[in-house]
Amino acid sequence: MGLESSENATGAVDQQERLDAYVAGFVDGEGCFHVALQRNPSTRGGWQLVPEFRVSQDAARIQVLYLVRARIGCGTVRENHRRSHDHTYVLIVRRRKDLLQRVIPFFERNPLVSCKQDEVVTFARIVRAMERGTHLRPEGFDRLAEEALTMNGGGRYRRVHRQFTIQNPQRPHAEHGAPIDAP
């Protein structure tokens, strides 16, 4: 009987490891580790860094988002682009404590296979620097913003506005009229 109990415990551990590997693989294909640069007039420089982990999925497979949320232990599932009619949902985690204590450790234990793992490393470095208050000093904010703007292939708006934003963070929209970062 003792052997059977031990085998069940080992089987449960194996099942959890396989489930975590599934979640990591799913996120590798459908997830995003992102640090937005958002205008915020109430901050000293008029801008803020907003780290976010997100995973999207069609409404027919929304249960996978709930599985990911259960495995990482945090996040909110909601409609993706509420004005859109594409019937997709998204799991979003923005709370820094959850990113630091749940999301980042999960993906450090279960690294992604693709080059997206580089985004995880950069994301973790930025979020940890923010936790230390690096973004509260102008030179620290500029360094983290520059690093954030290199993530996710530069993004459409990021490529266009990157240099202008870093050189003049108070007025990046004055001449261009486009958002720095569109989700």
Feature-to-residue mapping (PLM):
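Sequence-level preference for short, compositionally simple segments enriched
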Residues: 1-183
